[in-house]
Structure formats: structure tokens, C-alpha cells
Amino acid sequence: MVSASLDGGLRICVRASAPEVHDKAVAWASFLKAPLNPENPEQYFFHFFVEPEGVYVRDQEKRLLEIDFDKNHLDYERKGHRGKNELIAKALGVAKGARRILDLSVGMGIDSVFLTQLGFSVIGVERSPVLYALLKEAFARTKKDSLKSYELHFADSLQFLKQNKGLLEVDAIYFDPMYPHKKKSALPKQEMVVFRDLVGHDDDASLVLQEALTWPVKRVVVKRPMQAEELLPGVRHSYEGKVVRYDTYVVG
């Protein structure tokens, strides 16, 4: 997976034309270690656009990745949800009083944002610099009151766990590691294509889970595809849906 830097060779540039966003574009170009408005942008696979209306990413195939919690284009609201009866809420221990969650892999924020709607307070960690930039802007622009207190960190999840153990008060840890996408003939929507190209999959997922299980929390929940093996042995209970399941490890 892309680490918390772009030194691994991710080909990305930052593009901006409006004068009012110049300073923001300079800041993000510095953060991403990417050139701003290069003479030959076609040489870069990913383009990070900074515009007055917001930021977004396009790849060379013109596929779009945008994070906007108010547009709900990625079904952030999940209308018709069952509230605390949702599998993810049950897995995290809402019935046991769990309220403060550490999300180790925010990604596009779909599960994190949903958890805030269910009444959880969420601390999120994202190690892809591009996704972090998109998320940071989305949280800054959102009008949703439930997201105003969201705490987002740019960090490698494994290092974050090691450095912050005992320093954060959380009831449960949530982890949704990326897994290899094998069915190339059935590509998902364009956002997921760009997302997977950006972040790949989590080679260190089992190490992250091992470290998470050392934290003083009530439980650790791992989201898995229905047919996938347990990330580590010791699952106390699995909350199974049609496509995914939530493996729960009881810690304390």
C-alpha cells in the first residue's frame, strides 16, 4: 500500500488555475511532494485538482475520485439503515456501551461517516497522502454537524498504534484492510477503480491487527469479504451480511 509519503514513485501532479486557490494548491503540492501545474501534465498518471468548489483526483483515463460527504454520491447516509441494529454497530459493541471508535483505515470515509451517524465518536487514521488530502478537504467543507468533531490523522496505522497506545481513550477499534481485487473483468464504479490504483492492498494487515489486539479496548472489529479467511485466529463472533462480515475479537 502507498505509505505516508509519495517517495514510492506514485506519479501525481497538482493542477490549479483559479488565483483564489493558489495558496491552497501550493500547500497540497508541498504535502504531496508533487509538482504544481507542470508543463507536461500528461506524463503523470494521477492529477490532483484544486478548484474553488473543492478538490478531486482524476487518472489518465479521466476516471474521477471525489470525496464529498454532503453530496452522498458514495451513499454516506445509507438511507433506510437500521440504526443501532446495523451489523457494524453490533460488532463494535453498541449494546455494551461502546461509543468512541478508532478507525484504522478511513479510506473514502464511507464506514467512518456512517459510524458518526449512528452516534459514535470516531478517530480516523489514513496513511495514503492523497486520500488524506481529499478527506481533509471534505471534512472542512461538510455542513453535517455530526462530522464537525471528527478527528482525522495522517499516519501509518501500525506506527500510530505503537505510538499512541495508552494515550487515547477508545472503546473499540475498527479495521477494514484492503484486500487484493482479483476479478479484473468486473470493475466496480470509477471511484473504486481510482481508489484501488492509489492505495493497492494492505500487505501488513495482520501486523496491524496484532498490534491493535494489544490495546486496552473492549474489542477489535475487522471487516472482511464473506469468503475471505480470518485475518488472525481468535475471532469471538462474526456478524455476517450478504457480501461482508464483521469479525469481532474480544480484548478486555
Swiss-Prot record:
A Pfam entry, by short name: SAM_MT
Q: Which residues bind S-adenosyl-L-methionine?
A: 126-127, 176
Q: Which InterPro entries match?
A: 16SrRNA_methylTrfase_J (IPR007536), SAM-dependent_MTases_sf (IPR029063)
Catalytic activity as recorded in UniProt = guanosine(1516) in 16S rRNA + S-adenosyl-L-methionine = N(2)-methylguanosine(1516) in 16S rRNA + S-adenosyl-L-homocysteine + H(+)
Instruction: Write the record's keywords in alphabetical order, separated by commas.
Output: Cytoplasm, Methyltransferase, rRNA processing, S-adenosyl-L-methionine, Transferase
- Return the EC number: 2.1.1.242
Q: What is this protein's function per UniProt?
A: Specifically methylates the guanosine in position 1516 of 16S rRNA.
Similarity comment text for this entry:
Belongs to the methyltransferase superfamily. RsmJ family.
PANTHER family registered for this protein in UniProt? RIBOSOMAL RNA SMALL SUBUNIT METHYLTRANSFERASE J
Name of the molecule in the record: Ribosomal RNA small subunit methyltransferase J
User: Which organism is this entry from?
Assistant: Bdellovibrio bacteriovorus (strain ATCC 15356 / DSM 50701 / NCIMB 9529 / HD100)
